From Swiss-Prot:
SUPFAM superfamilies, alphabetized: Flavoproteins
UniProt-annotated binding residues for FMN: 9, 15-17, 138-141
Keyword Phosphoprotein: no
Family under the similarity heading: Belongs to the azoreductase type 1 family.
Record's keyword terms, sorted: Flavoprotein, FMN, NAD, Oxidoreductase
Subunit structure: Homodimer.
Any matching Pfam family: Flavodoxin_2
Enzyme class: oxidoreductase
Protein source organism: Delftia acidovorans (strain DSM 14801 / SPH-1)
Gene designation per UniProt: azoR
Cofactor list: FMN
Disulfide cysteine pairs (residue numbers): none
Name recorded for this polypeptide: FMN-dependent NADH:quinone oxidoreductase
GO MF terms held by the record: electron transfer activity; FMN binding; oxidoreductase activity, acting on NAD(P)H as acceptor; oxidoreductase activity, acting on NAD(P)H, quinone or similar compound as acceptor
Amino acid sequence: MQVLHIDSSITGAASVSRQLTAQTVAALVAANPGAKVEYLDLAVNAPDHLNAVSMGFRTGQAATTEAERAQNAISEALVSQFLAADVVVVGAPFYNFTISSQLKAWIDRIAQGGRTFRYTAAGPEGLAKGKKVIVASTRGGVYSTSEMGQALEHQESYLKTVFGFLGITDVSIVRAEGVAMGDESKAKALESARSDIVRAAAAANQEAAIAA
């Protein structure tokens, strides 16, 4: 099993999503001692947001400058790392109703025509099939239990849409919400998330056993 462990929280040791991704990866490795884990901390080493220099892979134009070649190499490294993974564990804190800009920058680098998706006469087709994604979703408030909250949520739904577009339909959510609503609320959120981790890791381990 090849695991790609991604964190994107900017709060360091205080991050709940980092705590949950670490616990998720630990559960995967405990059941698969031979698992290989690659770690990507987007708060420390995020790719630049796309611009005229870094979007060569989208236009198909060959790099003509050192800056363009350097940006193309970053995009290639990130998409190759993603495609090599069997399981992707993503820490996705809820910032202003959506994901962090660092995580969005990573998505923009791996969403590559001809690599992770393609357009066909029948419509778009994802090319990253067969992977499992586990999203550690953390929120200061509670958004999943009301119609108003769900209307404001563009985090989990966005990630499911993006990964689905890339061909990944096996997306599990490890959710801790209400973590900024007092100690009792945070404790309940973490307890619920730990149950999510057990279920998500068990499903991934079962799929790995079948594949083996």
